[in-house]
Amino acid sequence: MGINVSRTADLGSNEWLQRFVGRHHIAHDDEAFWNGLLNYNIVLPENSQDQLNLDSRLETLCQSFIGNNLKTGNFGSLVTVFLEKTSELLSLSDQESNMHVWQTFNALFIIRTLVKYINETGSEFQLLQHFEALPSAELVQAAVELQQQTPAESATIAIEATEQAAAAAASAPVFVDGAKFETFIDALVNLIVVIPVKEFTYHLHLEAVNMLITLLSVHLFAQQPTEKSIVFRTVFKCQHANVLMSALLHFVARMVEVPHTMFGSSSAGSIVFGIAESLLSIFTFRKQQDVLKASNAVGGELSLQFRTHYPLANQSLLLILILTNHCTAQENAYRASLFGCADSKDSPKQGTVSFQIDFSAVYETLCRIVTIDQATLLLYLLLHRNERFYRFVMQQQDLEQLVIPILQTLYNAPDSNSHHIYMSLIVLLILSEDEGFNKNVHTIMLKNITWYTERSISEISLGGILILIVIRTIQYNMLKMRDKYLHTNCLAALANMSGHFRALHPYVAQRLVSLFETLARKHTRLDAQLKEPADSAVFVNVVTTAEDMLQDLSVLEEVLRMVLEILNSCLTNQLVYCPNLVYTLLYKRSVFEGFRSHHAFQDVVQNIDMVVGFFSSRLQRVQEQRGELGVNEVLEVISKGASQWSSDRLRKFPDLKFKYVEEDAPEEFFIPYVWTLVCKYGCVHFSSESIKTVTTDIAC
């Protein structure tokens, strides 16, 4: 079987492509032409430079296409060929469909390349014009005669017909009713959801997902709102939102590794998919996550590995985020579908179920890749809006598999972008809304946490390391980001957990009190500066005005108050289980002196003073009997005293319970963030020079 292999280098001079973008109409049933055009192998661009090289080699062909297609309608013919091949695929056996899959992929790749070019250089209306463009009657007649004549005769006929039709076709408007475009979208969805993912169909599924992303990228290049976009309206009125969302989430959960060859072909170009390769396909498709497990990569490095080895999962994840974060002000069937899915191992009795999926597979995959932005965003959506998935996660016995990677993202804050830090903290806040979670994290013990380098800790609870990382994030934010909302989310998570603090590691107790101490020193400095005369040196720096300092002081007092309430909540509810915290408070009692008479803090400090006074007097009595006490002896006295302590002595405060509430107009945050991730970590590389509506310089 002879196969024409077209490499990137010779695409610009390919005779079939030149005819396709030329001035002659090519009918969709011209099998000789389409077989010639679609019999090529191509290495897909792997990065922006590859895409740039491909774009530059195709530039002349694309310009010819733009100049001629509205007259020839060849793009519409290609779309029709794709529609026919997609329809035929559903009825073919594996062996019969290999060549079909290959040609369908090639047709779709050409369509995507042209759609991308039109998006980047034209308008959405022009894109739809090219989809719907029909050839003139003269060109159609010439194409019919072309198929019937000898090469010499056909060339003469085509030239004559082209010259006769050129003037009329150039001025005739192309009417856009969107019918072919809608049919094309439906075919893409059918391809994704109906055809099973096998080794030789993997790249076809990937190309279909990439095609949808490329179509929706019209948002990047248009200056109109998506509510007015015909592309968005067509995609979002799709009747099959549930099955598409189900397929995409299954692609993510299964994390199938990209096959070593495309369409089951060997390096020699054979398209035979034999028994041996079938067995190899089954074997390689089951060997999941080995690459990522072996590397132990996180963050940006993991994102690149995920894109390279699991492109279908990566692109499906990005498409899920696009579909669920756009059009949130009105009914969004994709969003409702994701939020309404249920575990396939359950039989939900309440609420509408959009589709069922193995939550265990989703959970395990998210645990593995949650250090990448797009996975954190998906986890956020599922936890925040899918109650069934939230309950499922809360029942897991290995919560450390999910929480530790999130903590690593926060720990590596200088290497993470602010959006990712923010979303990771929100996920922790949502998790901390569950009392079961707050109890369980202190029963899960961890050993030898090598990535935490501040101090060597041989053993600590998951709750303990969580507290340490959140405190560290607060301190990092104070120095670098100064984001009030970041402080709020950090403290809200700690506050939710505080009533369940147990068996705190000595270092955790020290860091909790040290956090207050650090904030207290800053408060004292700011307060002193504000009380200095207005003409003193403190105001020489015009950037820091008195108003700025007053605002800083107000925020600082809110944070200090919250830290005191967190300490008070722990002492009120868990004092008997937190001897190390009591020990640290006794040792650091002086840090509270300046706040006993402060109107904003005195009621909470009074409780802490009462606890410190109770244990201090007991220690004093024991010391009078035994002399100086060692650390273990002090802890023994605290433990005995705790058994006799009654929290009824303390002033009552409301329980600390905070719930995450999404801000107004969340799309203003999420849409630019999602498209930044698509541009940075996706397999489709767009021209950054042409992007108008979304800045892609968010540090990812």
UniProtKB/Swiss-Prot annotation:
The lineage of its organism: Eukaryota, Metazoa, Ecdysozoa, Arthropoda, Hexapoda. This is Dymeclin. The keyword Lipoprotein applies. The keyword Repeat does not apply. GO terms for biological process: Golgi organization. One of its GO terms (cellular component) is Golgi apparatus. Transmembrane segments: none annotated. The modification Phosphoserine is found at S347. InterPro entries: Dymeclin. Pfam families: Dymeclin (PF09742). Belongs to the dymeclin family. Keywords: Lipoprotein, Myristate, Phosphoprotein. A lipid is attached at G2 (N-myristoyl glycine).
